[in-house]
């Protein structure tokens, strides 16, 4: 039997407990999960690509234990379906917080299925405890000196505190 690889794309700027929740679900479905950090030239991320890789890898080690070794973090600047193919994925993972996410993700899944019928999109609903968490809100709270510890892994909370106290 061949290993099943899933591709989980996002900006992860920063990684949140919501992302980790989806990642845990993805690890139930796949042997390996490739976390694809989308690089968009028009966007100015808070954390550099290298910082995001380090934060994801450290968070996975701290929060997922041995399962953290089943993830791989990569960058991509092309279509997500092309990135998934390059990394040998047969599944694309998408997290859902609410109906707004579902509407958008269904549209994207339909387009992706037309262009890459061999890739299966799997929607994983967020656990109730993380449904309200967004990276945008986390950045806003951190930028105003608020406590983001309930919303992100400890290593990310420390990095945000450092970033905004500089």
UniProtKB/Swiss-Prot annotation:
Localization terms from the record: Cytoplasm
Catalytically driven reaction(s): (R)-4'-phosphopantetheine + ATP + H(+) = 3'-dephospho-CoA + diphosphate
Cofactor requirements of the protein: Mg(2+)
Molecular function GO labels: ATP binding; pantetheine-phosphate adenylyltransferase activity
Keyword list, A-Z: ATP-binding, Coenzyme A biosynthesis, Cytoplasm, Magnesium, Nucleotide-binding, Nucleotidyltransferase, Transferase
InterPro entries: Cyt_trans-like, PPAT, Rossmann-like_a/b/a_fold
A cellular component term, taken from the record's GO annotations: cytoplasm
Binding residues annotated for ATP, in chain numbering: 11-12, 19, 95-97, 105, 130-136
GO annotation, biological process: coenzyme A biosynthetic process
Pathway the protein takes part in: Cofactor biosynthesis; coenzyme A biosynthesis; CoA from (R)-pantothenate: step 4/5
The EC number(s) this enzyme carries: 2.7.7.3
Site (Transition state stabilizer) residue list: 19
Positions bound to substrate: 11, 43, 80, 94
Superkingdom, natural source: Bacteria
Subunit structure: Homohexamer.
Family to which the UniProt record says this protein belongs: Belongs to the bacterial CoaD family.
Function: Reversibly transfers an adenylyl group from ATP to 4'-phosphopantetheine, yielding dephospho-CoA (dPCoA) and pyrophosphate.
Name of the molecule in the record: Phosphopantetheine adenylyltransferase
Recorded name of the encoding gene: coaD
């Amino acid at each position: 039997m061949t290993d099943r690889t899933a591709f989980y794309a996002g900006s992860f700027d920063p990684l949140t407990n919501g992302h980790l929740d989806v990642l845990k679900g993805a690890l139930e479905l796949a042997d390996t999960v490739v976390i694809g950090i989308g690089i968009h030239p028009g966007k100015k991320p808070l954390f550099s690509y290298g910082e995001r890789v380090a934060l994801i890898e450290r968070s996975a080690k701290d929060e997922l234990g041995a399962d953290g070794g089943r993830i791989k973090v990569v960058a991509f600047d092309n279509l997500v379906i092309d990135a998934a193919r390059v990394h040998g994925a047969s599944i694309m993972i998408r997290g859902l917080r609410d109906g707004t996410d579902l509407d958008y993700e269904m549209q994207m899944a339909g387009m992706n299925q037309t262009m890459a019928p061999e890739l299966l999109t799997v929607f994983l609903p967020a656990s109730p405890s993380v449904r309200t968490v967004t990276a945008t809100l986390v950045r806003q709270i951190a930028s105003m000196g608020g406590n983001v510890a309930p919303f992100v892994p400890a290593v990310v909370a420390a990095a945000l505190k450092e970033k905004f106290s500089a």
